[in-house]
């Protein structure tokens, strides 16, 4: 099976997506037929496999290429010899952050009936907004940390609104999990943390920062009527991972398996199933969990994890191919114009 990797985007995580695509190339190798780069101005470019390295993008050489136009079933390439349609194999949406994870590209691909692996519109909207994610989890019976939601109108009253003690964590509601995130240990650090978070989002979440919490990551997808899970990862424990630590090191090919009980692993999987539901059909997602006093809490849903979290799967290629056979179908609407014909008949 062949794939097309779509990456880049007008996003704060633009570089993350490039690194993610380069890493996935090393995993899937000759199964990737096309690499399609989306720049910050929303132009599409076809990138040769030989140019899929960081130096090429650091020098912005793709600007010398002719831009492509997304259309039904593929991309339109104009040249002196006329227009040509590049028919796309199954697309992997690997655009992190805005454009890729907020639903814009999902809408565009669905509109042009281009088959793709990735979250659909509704799943993107719910998972990209951390506040909506909490509401979604609560509705499904999945625990999440307490929080306060701030906007520009009430940020001046932040300390009055926060109902928990220092330290707490300040994060943008709409952004990657490490962008604009700060741990606030005392009052004088709050202004900087809020300024940083509001750079990335119009709304900001504040959560209690709990020392010594256990963290576990689990990726997976739905195959037909069952689930395919990765193994559980326990991330390296630091106060929190910054942007570079979390995203720009894709050199690892495997992550260490977590040492946890079978009972806890089953709890994580059951919570994952609830969150995946039917909403995330067609996507490989990663759910990041906290375990606090033997209770499982959702930290976040990553609808397009870096390099699709391939390093967490024992057989990623088979998982991807099985998912490709389990994509949700969009029913085609048959337009018959019967009402219009009846109007004409009655005239």
From Swiss-Prot:
Where ATP binds, per the record, is at 161-216
Q: What cellular-component terms does GO give this entry? A: cytoplasm
Keywords (alphabetical) are:
ATP-binding, Cell shape, Cell wall biogenesis/degradation, Cytoplasm, Ligase, Magnesium, Manganese, Metal-binding, Nucleotide-binding, Peptidoglycan synthesis
List GO molecular-function terms, semicolon-separated.
ATP binding; D-alanine-D-alanine ligase activity; metal ion binding
Membrane-spanning segments: none
Zinc as a keyword of this entry, yes or no, is no
InterPro entries attached here?
ATP-grasp, ATP_grasp_subdomain_1, D-Ala_lig_Van_CS, D_ala_D_ala, Dala_Dala_lig_C, Dala_Dala_lig_N, PreATP-grasp_dom_sf
Q: For the ATP-grasp domain, which residue ranges apply?
A: 134-332
| Catalytic activity entry | 2 D-alanine + ATP = D-alanyl-D-alanine + ADP + phosphate + H(+)
Tell me which residues bind Mg(2+) 2. Answer: 300, 302
Name any cofactors this protein relies on. Mg(2+); Mn(2+)
Broad EC category: ligase
Chief localisation class: cytoplasm
At which positions is Mg(2+) 1 bound? 288, 300
The GO biological-process annotations, alphabetized, read as: cell wall organization; peptidoglycan biosynthetic process; regulation of cell shape
Q: Which NCBIfam families match?
A: D_ala_D_alaTIGR, PRK01966.1-3
Q: Which HAMAP family match?
A: Dala_Dala_lig
- UniProt protein name: D-alanine--D-alanine ligase
Q: What is the lineage of its organism?
A: Bacteria, Pseudomonadati, Campylobacterota, Epsilonproteobacteria, Campylobacterales
Gene behind this protein:
ddl
